Regions:
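C-terminal peripheral helix-coil segments that are non-catalytic and often amphipathic
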Residues: 1-2, 98, 102, 130, ...
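Hydrophobic alpha-helical connector segments
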Residues: 77-108, 154-161, 190
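N-terminal intrinsically disordered/low-complexity leader segments
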Residues: 1-13, 20
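Hydrophobic/aromatic residues within well-ordered alpha-helical segments
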Residues: 14, 57, 64, 68, ...
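Helix-turn-helix
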Residues: 13, 17, 25-59, 63
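Amphipathic alpha-helical linker/stalk segments
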Residues: 62-91, 136-142
């Protein structure tokens, strides 16, 4: 392995470590309540090292949000991969539920940003996210024209999927309390995922 390749791999590993720590701390404290020193401590690195990779807190915050959205948009690639709506919607819901299970802090960072008026994401929502959503909407409308699904407002369908799947991350503490103070077991979470899939498919006659 060349020295250059090794440097690139080290950089990627360090950036991933910092982003994971930042996702957690931003989710807990919010943007204003977070200092880069808090993130550095969570990552187990000196603050100077953090700023070597991310010059400012704002840069880091934007990168965290970008990574979250990139993964969410990648989950919807099922709309292109699968020709049948049942397969596409099933895979999409499962991917979203898995993200909420594995990356609850990511979902909460996003929720905090939106609930605060999207000061950082505002322009991004009106461009990148809107373009992506419009592609999903066109696919859903095509399914309707082809009579593969019952008529449905594509925006309402997407919002319903987002609200339900992200609930398992954003309101995890509420679920724990209502579940007798225990996290949902892997088995129970799989059952919940299948139930959400069933409800989504049923909403469009599948």
């Amino acid at each position: 392995m060349s020295t250059q390749i090794r440097k690139i791999e080290i950089r990627k590993a360090n950036e991933a470590l910092i982003l994971e720590a930042a996702e957690k701390i931003f989710a807990i404290n919010g943007y204003k309540g977070t200092a880069t020193g808090d993130i550095a401590r969570e990552a187990g690195i000196p603050k100077a090292n953090l700023h070597y990779y991310f010059k400012t807190k704002s840069n880091l915050y934007r990168e965290v949000l970008k990574h979250i959205l990139d993964e969410w948009m990648a989950a919807a690639s099922t709309f292109d991969i699968y020709h049948e709506p049942e397969e596409a919607l099933r895979a999409y819901v499962k991917a979203k539920m898995e993200f909420s299970r594995q990356r609850p802090f990511g979902s909460r960072v996003w929720a905090r940003e939106i609930m605060s008026g999207a000061p950082v994401l505002h322009n991004f929502l009106g461009t990148t996210l809107k373009v992506w959503l419009n592609e999903c909407v066109r696919t859903i409308r095509r399914w309707t024209r082809e009579e593969k699904i019952d008529p449905v407002d594509p925006h309402v369908l997407m919002y319903m999927i987002w609200a339900t799947t992200q609930h398992y991350a954003d309101f995890e503490q509420q679920i724990i309390i209502l579940n007798g103070g225990k996290q949902l077991s892997d088995r129970r979470y799989r059952q919940s995922t299948e139930e959400v899939v069933r409800l989504v498919l049923g909403s469009v006659g599948l």
